[in-house]
């Protein structure tokens, strides 16, 4: 069978909002997500910093200031709260079945600037052959320490190439 890859961003593609808006931003003190994202933009500009690294850094700093411990499980659990667009959960099986009828092996991939651990907590995580998304480095207690991988807009093209080459 011929292999076909469907490649998705996550935020505002499969879900109506940025994943951090499903609880974690409120917990660190942002009732209005725009205030957080504006702060991230300011930090990125002031420090000539990649915006993805800036949001990851800011999540760490804000959580520390509020005494909130963000670890793998915290991110995974917040992923369970992410709302998906109507029809998204059914889409994957439908398109795989459609492809199979036509002799195609359909695979689904995520390439996202969002957080991999949160995507893993969603109800659709199992649908993906691979999830390429931003990740944190964790300490011995699984608490986040620092951004480990930040997938920005230009890096996404690198992952398209990797998928095309069979990873």
Residue positions per predicted region:
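Alpha-helical substrate-recognition element adjacent to the catalytic core
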Residues: 1-145
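Conserved acidic, metal-coordinating active-site core of Asp-based
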Residues: 129, 133-167
